[in-house]
Amino acid sequence: MTLDKLIEKLAAKSSILITPITVKDYLAYKIEPNFLLPFLKALKESEELRFTLLTDLFGADFPQNNVVNSVGLGHKEQGAKPITNRRTTSDNVGESKSIDYKRFEVVYNLLSLKLNKRLIIKVYISEKETIPSAMNIFSAACWYEREVYDMYGVNFEGNDDKRRILTDYEFEGHPLRKDFPLTGYTQVKYDEKLKKVAYEPVDLDIEYREFDFSSHWHSPSYVLPGDEKATDVIPAKAGIQK
């Protein structure tokens, strides 16, 4: 029996709903947050699979992501109604369609030493939702979850350790969110009077600039060596040699 069939059989046996998704070179599934812990536990304890290592756990932010909740394998139904979140669109008069904007993607990367195989599990949540912590199944999840919280503000239910792990303790916001300003909210400097590091509002010493790389003033007019994307050789401008 192939690996995907074994996993789908395990999910069906435990009444866990999973949906196959396409990820290059990897076997991957999408799952709803309420099924995450039972699925992780089943994968770890299965004698046939033995996905005993959580090698990575990370997040991504897609603000316009409209992933709709769906019933996957291991369930009698063929589909499920999406959960209403923030927006409702109408295609026809008198008919409305709800869209669940799940902007955050949390990815679990599992490894089976027995099979020498990797498995990717993706969970999608909205800003107001939480994900159950996997600490009691994989102890390594604690620091991974702290990193995802630090970078994106995703809360893991059951993990009360909200200490910053990559940024400093007084950092404001979550820097990998798409709505986080490029300049940040505060800047750090060493205060000679206080004899310690101090935080203050961002004060740019020079005007904030947006570089237009399509302008010949800021980009080379010749094809860069090794640029496989270049199809035509751009004529050299005056004063610029190929």
UniProtKB/Swiss-Prot annotation:
It is a peripheral membrane protein. The keyword Nuclease does not apply. Pfam families: Complex1_30kDa. This is NADH-quinone oxidoreductase subunit C. HAMAP family: NDH1_NuoC. Keywords: Cell inner membrane, Cell membrane, Membrane, NAD, Quinone, Translocase, Transport, Ubiquinone. It comes from Rickettsia conorii (strain ATCC VR-613 / Malish 7). It catalyses: a quinone + NADH + 5 H(+)(in) = a quinol + NAD(+) + 4 H(+)(out). InterPro entries: NADH_DH_suC, NADH_quin_OxRdtase_su_C/D-like, NADH_UbQ_OxRdtase_30kDa_su, RPE2. The lineage of its organism: Bacteria, Pseudomonadati, Pseudomonadota, Alphaproteobacteria, Rickettsiales.
